[in-house]
Structures are given as C-alpha cells and as structure tokens.
C-alpha cells in the first residue's frame, strides 16, 4: 500500500489545492481545444462561440464557478464537485439582479480574504437535500448492497496484497488493447511530491484514472483465480464446459456470464460479481463528502433487448451443459494450452451497471473532471474488451451450431413432424400454451379454415429457427418462383407492408415500389407516366400497365421453362406419309411435254390450281385469270383422254352452282374457254369432237346429268324417307340450305349458258318440258322454285325463240302459255306456302303486266366502274325528283298567297296555316276590296260550299 493510500486526508488536500490552481486554466485550455461550449453535461449548443468558458471566472459573479454550468447536471448535490470547491474570491460572490441566487447551505473555508493564506480544510456538515434513491437489484430481483461489497473487498485486500504477476499481465494487456502510456507509481518521497505539483492537473487525473483501472482489473483477476481454484477443489474434475451460473452463498450479487476467447469456448468459468472500487475509495477523500450514486435509467426498448439477449445466452448455456465427456476432455486440453485472458468479459446488461459504478468511482477519487484524452483511453480499453467478447461469442455460436446440428432443425424434419401431428380443428378456440396469444377473431373467415393475423405469426419468429437442407431445396425450394409484383426492388409487395416502412412512420402503408419520392420532383416525366408509376392509394398497390403485366408474365413463363429440368426427347423421325404443305413440297421430277417447255400437271395439281384461280376471279381480273385457266385447259393437247380439260370444266361447274350470284361470270368464262380453246384437243372416247365442241359436250353432259337428278335427293330425310324439318342452326339445316343453293344455282347457270348461246333452244325446251311434267302431279316447293328461277333468267329470251323438230316448228311463247296455265291452276287450287304462292303471282305479273321488264334484271356481278356509274345515276334521279318537288311547291305557294285566309275564331279548334312574315312585310298594304264577292271564287272548293258555309 502506498503512502498516499495510508494518508488519504493529506493526499486529498494536496489534490484539492492543485485542482484549485489548475482548474481554470485546464478548463479554458480544454474548451479552446474542443471549440465549443459545454452546457448541461457537454451538449453542443453554439459551436465556436464560448459563453463564460474562455475566462478564468465569471465577471458577473456567476455562482457556478469557473468550471462549466451545472457540473454534469447536479444543481445542489455536493458530490458533483468531485472533492473540490470553487475559490471564494470576490469574482465568485453572486450579484443580485443578474442570476437567481440559490441558497448556500454551508460557508466554505475558502470564504476568506483574497490575500490571506489558505487554512486547513475543516470538514463541514453538508445540508444538501436528500436526492431520490434508486434501488439496485440483481437479475432475480433481490436487493444489491454496494456497501457490503465494498467492505468485503476491503477485507479481502487487507488479507492478501496484489501479486506482481497480475500487474505485469495487466500491464501487457493494457499495452495491447489501449494506448501505450507509462503508468507512474505513486511515491511518498518529498522530491516526487514536489515534482507531482509541477505536473498539470489533467496529467495527474489521467494517471490516477489509469492506475485505478489497473487495480480494479487486478482484483478481478485475483478473484477469478480464487473461484477457479475453489471450484476445481470441490469438483475433482475441472469444469471445461461453457460458462455456468455460479452463486455464492449468503451474497445477493448479480451474476455475470463470462465470454472467453475462441480458445476457451468450452471452459467452465464462474461468473464475475459486480464490484465496487474499494481501491479508488481509499485513495479518494475519506468521509468528507458522501456521494449518492444515480444509476442510468434504461428505456423500455433497452430492457426488452437485454431480456432477449439474456434468454438467448441462457439457452446456449443450457445446450452446452449437455455436451458429452469426450468433448469436455478435448476442450480441457485446449484451455490448458491457451493463455488466460487478462480481463473478464461480462454480459451486456451488466456492462451498463458497471459503467455507472465506474463513473461513481471516478467522481469519488479524481479531484477534477477527466480530460478528453483520459476518456478516449478508457473507451479504447472498453472497445478492446468488447472485441474479445465478440470473437469469443462468434466462435462459441459456431461451435454450438456445429455440435447441435443433428438434423432436427431442418425444414424436412419439421415437415415430417407436422405430418404426424394432430391438426387443430378450430384455431380460434384452441387453448395455446402460456406466453402465446391466440389469433385475432377478426381474421376468421367462413370459407377458409386456417386464417391468421400477422401479430399471431410474428410470435414464432424467434422460436422457430430452422434452416433449409439439401433435400428440401431440391424437392421444393427450386420450384418456388417469386413474381416481380409487386415491385422492381427485388421484393414482393407484401414484404414492404409490415416492417420496411417503420422509419417513415407509415406502419402498414405500402410505399411506392418505383421510388415515387425521387420522381415527384422530376419535370421531364410525362403526366401519363407519373399516373402509371405512382401508387394507387386506395388499393395500396402500384399501377402496372397491361403491357408490363404481359411482359412480366412472359418473363415468368420463360424463367419457369428455364428452371424446369430438360427432358431427353428422342429426335423426330419424319414418317413417309406425313402431311406437308403444298408450297413446301418440292417435286423431285418435273414432267415436261414433248416440246420441252410445257409442264404436265397431275389431276390433284390441276384441281388445286383451279380452285385457287377461281377464288381470285372477278370481273376486273377476268382477262388475266381466264387466260391462266385457258393455259391449264390447253395441257390436254398432250393427252389422249382430255383428263385435264374435264377437271377444268368440273371445277367451273361446281363453283358456278355453289355461287348463284356469280353464275353469269362463270358462264362468260365457259364461253371464253369454248371460243379460245386449242382445236387440236381430242378425246378417244368421243370421236369426231375436238376443241370447242368437246368442251360443249362435257358441259352439256354435266348439266343434263345434274338437272335430271335434281337437288331434292340431297336434302336430309328421316329413316323412312320422309322429308326432315331440320332445326335452326343445326347440321341438317346447313346441309339442306347447301343443297337448295346448289340446285337453284344449277338452274341459274343453265339459264345464263342459254343466254350466251352455249345451249340451244331445243335443250331449253327439254328443260321446261321436264319441269312441266313434275308440275302436273302434286308439285313440290323445290320444283316450283326451280321453275320461277328459270323463268326469271330466260323468260324474256325464250318468249321469242323457236326451233324446228322435224317438219314442225315450235314457238317458245306457246310453251310458256301452257306453262303459265298450269301455274294459274296451282295458285288457285294447290295447297302451297304463301312464300311460293306470292312468287308465282309475281312471275305471272312480270310476263303479262310488265312484259319481262324486271327491276332485278341487273342484279348480278358488276365491275367497280359499273357500280360508280349506277350510284351516279341514282344521285341524278334523286336530284331531279327534288327539283321537281320544289318547283311544284313554289307554284302552289304562289297561288296560296292570292287566297284570303278565313279569320280564325277563338272558339274554333281548326288550325290555320301561318305564312312567312318576310313575304307579308314585302307585300304592299292591302287595298280595300268590295264587300260583295264577285262570281269568280278564289277558293277551289267554293263551288261545293254555300254562302252560309263561307260565313261560318
């Protein structure tokens, strides 16, 4: 023990006098270095503008002394002066009127004349108000008595002095973890005392502070070794496991779990009890000023954090206690070979209390406030200790996870356990264990069995810690696709709804995924884009255009296809009879005619080309397409059976029957083929007929055969053969409509062939005779429609036609007279539908009354020029009719002005026509007419009326 410790009163007086001399200069120097003023515990209010701090004292007699204001926030506490009092000179006497005078509870001995010598310090009883007492408790809630700890440490230090070995170790540790500063040893020699007076107060404070820290660490090291030896003596096997909670009997000291370096991860070390620095109390004043410690009050969030960390460490400690003996032996050898750390690392919750007590010790031992350099050195030492704690904790966590990873905390294991678990029928009425709140009833839905709120699910966030294993990742996780929905920040829309917006105070409001705040000040973005990109506040969802959604879905599909494992597919082997488009199929060989230029076509190719050309055939392109058709027909020159010519005539005939409206155009096509066909074409089966005659033979034979069959046989019938009345829009309905269209198209096509003189009058006479035969015996509606269609087509021309049969001559008009006689009988007697009956009446009127001048005569295919000419004619007719009507109206109005309108009585309900005021204004004023009317009546109906009628 040093002389300074043996004579605390003398040491305190020396320190006090030195503090009084150096305090003003040190304060001025330190504040000039900082460059700002310290108000209320070092808060920076006005930088570079010192108030009452750059002077050795307050010129206005401020009562707070030459130091800072309020001295760490304690207004009237004597302990805040740190063992020294301000000098009582004239400048420190409070002036009334400038500051509020607080009561002075004692008269310090410095209140003497300024020039008098200082007297010996005499302890004076302090009359300060009793501050609020804060009770310090342990983790278990028991009361912590700091005085008893202080006494116990004093007794332990008296029994045994500190060995030099820990001091050397402490010195090495302090050199490695803190700033390298030599620690001066206090001496009792007068020469050293005189040299200490010359040293600045800041340097003395720094050295004293470092010395006390080293003494405290040495005491902790000694106590830890004693506890290790005691625990190893009681338990024959040294404890090499993780730290356990060791409690001393008869003491209520808080327990502190110690965290060692990675080399000592599994060593069993007793917890360090919270100490009170007795060494500092011995070197400070002894009973002059009694200090009341005011520990720091923790906030609610800090307490929750401390409790959570405490639980986690307790769980880790319990898990480490259950380790096997071989692991203990390995850790024992590792610990024996590893060096013992010089300082103990404590839990985070007890570090706060230790810091508070170290602040109390500093205030009790140091006569002045530690400078910035002292605080920095202490912070460096604390950071070094925290670094050691973090390293040991990380290594301990890694070891623990490696040892406890036995496959029970994987996703696959949890899923297997859930399969065997009994499901909960009603999650809202189920009794959950203590500490777990059930789900809120407002999330209950009738059509969904299990619904939970976020509050219920967040309870299991820290309790269920599992990691993904390879089996689960391969089977399930690889198939999970997170859509970009939500957002372009690589997060879903729902992920930012709960926890990511707390800093903005929105709680559960979803912010714009597309950074709306950054875009709000942009003037270059268009209004349309800003509407798309901003949030929809009603739905809390960002607007996405349809194109973006389609792109996103397309990208998702591509991503899913990429993620799917590619299946091995056998290469495609094309079959011999596979379907190939005609334009892709290439001929291996081309058949050429003997001339070497003309290409010979098969029957299928002829039909395909004819269908294509007939679909393109119009009156505007008639010449070009008909020339191509004629070229195909001329291929029959190199044939002996006329196969190509038959195919051409067949396709034209089918197309003409299927499209009755274009029958005249197809008849013109047949006429061009007959006229321009190569006369060298022959057919072995039809001798004597070549070229055009062969075409007419094919055409007449095809029309005659189809006309004899009729089109009634193509109509759908019942099983017994009776006609079927198909339902609307059914397959039978379309089949019947197609058969009717083709039958009437055939009759119309035959009629246009006759009008182009491709069929003779004799052929047409045979057609009418066949129809008249069918009309005599209960004719069908199909036969009557065919007769009406043929008469509309060839009636006018057949009326004047005649032909010879042997020596007799037959007139067409005579045949038509007998035909219309049969039709009159059918109209009067036969039971036919009204539609057919009116058609027969119309065709009868067309012959007898209109002389075959029908309005529908020109209803056929027309060119674009013909359509325009027809529209122009109709427009001119309409204009002429309007001009005629205007002329008629003008003439009638001219006569109406000459009439005298009868006066309309009020009781009469007859409305009279009012004429324009414009004409009445221009007209000259009426002349007086004689009362007696003349015999000439101005009213055209006056001859039918009497005089009494006019008067009325």
UniProtKB/Swiss-Prot annotation:
Span list, region Disordered? 1-77, 115-389, 481-575, 870-952
Xref: InterPro entries? ARM-type_fold (IPR016024), eIF4G1_eIF4E-bd (IPR022745), eIF4G_eIF4E-bd_sf (IPR036211), MIF4G-like_typ-3 (IPR003890)
Establish whether keyword Nucleus is in the entry.
no
Gene3D superfamilies xref list: 1.25.40.180, eIF4G, eIF4E-binding domain
Q: Where in the cell is it found?
A: Cytoplasm; Cytoplasm, P-body; Cytoplasm, Stress granule
Q: Spell out the subunit comment.
A: Component of the eIF4F complex, which composition varies with external and internal environmental conditions. It is composed of at least eIF4A (TIF1/TIF2), eIF4E (TIF45) and eIF4G (TIF4631 or TIF4632). Interacts with PAT1 in a RNA-dependent manner.
Its biological purpose is as follows:
Component of the eIF4F complex, which interacts with the mRNA cap structure and serves as an initial point of assembly for the translation apparatus. Stimulates translation by interaction with polyadenylate-binding protein PAB1, bringing the 5'- and 3'-ends of the mRNA in proximity. The formation of this circular mRNP structure appears to be critical for the synergistic effects of the cap and the poly(A) tail in facilitating translation initiation, recycling of ribosomes, and mRNA stability. TIF4631 is probably essential when TIF4632 is missing.
Q: Can you name this protein?
A: Eukaryotic initiation factor 4F subunit p150
Q: Which organism is it from?
A: Saccharomyces cerevisiae (strain ATCC 204508 / S288c) (Baker's yeast)
């Amino acid at each position: 023990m040093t002389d300074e410790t043996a004579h605390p009163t003398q040491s305190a007086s020396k320190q006090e006098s030195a503090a009084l001399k150096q305090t003003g200069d040190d304060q001025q120097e330190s504040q000039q270095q900082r460059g700002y003023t310290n108000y209320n515990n070092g808060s920076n209010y006005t930088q570079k503008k010192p108030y009452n701090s750059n002077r050795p004292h307050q010129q206005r007699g401020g009562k707070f002394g030459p130091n800072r204001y309020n001295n760490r926030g304690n207004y009237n506490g004597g302990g805040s002066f740190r063992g020294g009092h301000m000098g009582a000179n004239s400048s420190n006497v409070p002036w009334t009127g400038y500051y509020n005078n607080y009561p002075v509870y004692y008269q310090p001995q410095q209140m003497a004349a300024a020039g008098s010598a200082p007297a010996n310090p005499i302890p004076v009883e302090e009359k300060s108000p009793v501050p609020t007492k804060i009770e310090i408790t342990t983790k278990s809630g028991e009361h912590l008595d700091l005085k008893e700890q202080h006494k116990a440490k004093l007794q332990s230090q008296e029994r045994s002095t500190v060995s030099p070995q820990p001091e050397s170790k402490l010195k090495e540790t302090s050199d490695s973890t803190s700033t390298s500063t030599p620690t001066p040893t206090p001496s009792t020699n007068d020469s050293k005392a005189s040299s200490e007076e010359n040293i600045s107060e800041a340097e003395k404070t720094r050295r004293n502070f470092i010395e006390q820290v080293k003494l405290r660490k040495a005491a902790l090291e000694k106590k830890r070794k004693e506890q290790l030896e005691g625990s190893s003596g009681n338990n024959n096997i040294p404890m090499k496991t993780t730290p356990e909670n060791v409690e001393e009997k008869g003491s209520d000291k808080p327990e502190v779990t110690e965290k060692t370096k990675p080399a000592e991860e599994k060593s069993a070390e007793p917890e360090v009890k919270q100490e009170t620095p007795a060494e500092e109390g011995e070197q400070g004043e002894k009973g002059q000023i009694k200090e009341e410690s005011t520990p720091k009050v923790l906030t609610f969030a800090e307490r929750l954090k401390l409790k959570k960390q405490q639980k986690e460490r307790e769980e880790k400690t319990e898990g480490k206690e259950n380790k096997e003996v071989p692991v203990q032996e390995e850790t024992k050898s590792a610990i024996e070979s590893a060096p013992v750390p010089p300082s103990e690392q404590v839990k985070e919750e007890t570090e706060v209390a230790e810091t508070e007590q170290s602040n109390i010790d500093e205030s009790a031992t140091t006569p002045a406030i530690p400078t910035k350099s002292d605080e920095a050195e202490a912070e460096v030492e604390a950071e070094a200790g925290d670094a050691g704690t973090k390293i040991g904790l990380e290594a301990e966590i890694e070891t623990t996870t490696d040892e406890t990873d036995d496959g029970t905390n994987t996703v696959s294991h949890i899923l297997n356990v859930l399969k065997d678990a009994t499901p909960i029928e009603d999650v809202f009425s189920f009794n959950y264990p203590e500490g777990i709140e059930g789900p809120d009833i407002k999330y209950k839905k009738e059509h969904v069995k299990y619904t939970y709120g976020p509050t219920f699910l967040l309870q299991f966030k820290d309790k269920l810690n599992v990691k993904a294993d390879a089996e689960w990742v391969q089977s399930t996780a690889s198939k999970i696709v997170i859509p970009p929905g939500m957002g372009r920040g690589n997060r879903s829309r729902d992920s930012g709804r709960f926890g990511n917006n707390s800093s903005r105070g929105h709680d559960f409001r979803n912010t714009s995924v597309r950074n709306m705040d950054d875009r709000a000040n942009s003037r270059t973005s268009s209004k349309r884009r800003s509407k798309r990109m901003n949030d929809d506040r009603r739905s809390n969802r960002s607007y996405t255009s349809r194109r973006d959604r389609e792109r996103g879905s397309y990208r998702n599909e591509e991503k899913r296809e990429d993620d799917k494992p590619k299946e091995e597919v056998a290469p495609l082997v094309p079959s011999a009879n596979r379907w190939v488009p005609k334009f892709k199929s290439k001929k291996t060989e081309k058949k050429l005619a003997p001339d070497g230029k003309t290409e010979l076509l098969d029957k299928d190719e002829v039909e395909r080309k004819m269908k294509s050309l007939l679909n393109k055939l119009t009156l505007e392109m008639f010449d070009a397409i008909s020339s191509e058709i004629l070229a195909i027909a001329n291929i029959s020159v190199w044939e002996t059976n006329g196969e190509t010519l038959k195919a051409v005539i067949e396709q034209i005939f089918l197309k003409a029957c299927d499209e009755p409206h274009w029958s005249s155009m197809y008849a013109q096509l047949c006429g061009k083929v007959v006229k321009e066909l190569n006369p060298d074409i022959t057919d072995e089966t039809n001798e004597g007929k070549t070229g055009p005659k062969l075409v007419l033979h094919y055409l007449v034979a095809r029309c005659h055969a189809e006309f004899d069959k009729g089109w009634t046989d193509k109509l759908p019938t019942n099983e017994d053969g009776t006609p079927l009345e198909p339902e609307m829009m059914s397959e039978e309905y379309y089949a019947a409509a197609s058969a009717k269209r083709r039958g009437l198209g055939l009759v119309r096509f035959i009629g246009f062939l006759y009008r182009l003189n491709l069929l003779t009058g004799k052929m047409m006479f045979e057609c009418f005779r066949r129809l008249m035969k069918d009309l005599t015996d209960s004719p069908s509606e199909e036969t009557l429609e065919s007769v009406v269609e043929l008469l509309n087509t060839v009636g006018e021309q057949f009326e004047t036609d005649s032909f010879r049969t042997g020596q007799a001559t037959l007139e067409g008009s005579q045949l038509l007279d007998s035909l219309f006689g049969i039709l009159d009988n059918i109209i009067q007697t036969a039971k036919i539908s009204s539609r057919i009956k009116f058609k027969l009446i119309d065709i009868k009127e067309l012959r007898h009354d209109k002389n075959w001048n029908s309005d529908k005569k020109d209803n056929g295919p027309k060119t674009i020029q013909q359509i325009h000419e027809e529209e122009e004619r109709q427009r001119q007719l309409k204009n002429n009719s309007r001009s005629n009507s205007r002329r008629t109206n003008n003439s009638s109005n001219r006569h109406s002005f000459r009439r005298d309108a009868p006066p309309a009585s009020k009781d009469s309900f007859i409305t009279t026509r009012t004429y324009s005021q414009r004409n009445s204004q221009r007209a000259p004023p009426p002349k007086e007419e004689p009362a007696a009317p003349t015999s000439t009546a101005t009213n055209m109906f006056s001859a039918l009326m009497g005089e009494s009628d006019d008067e009325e």
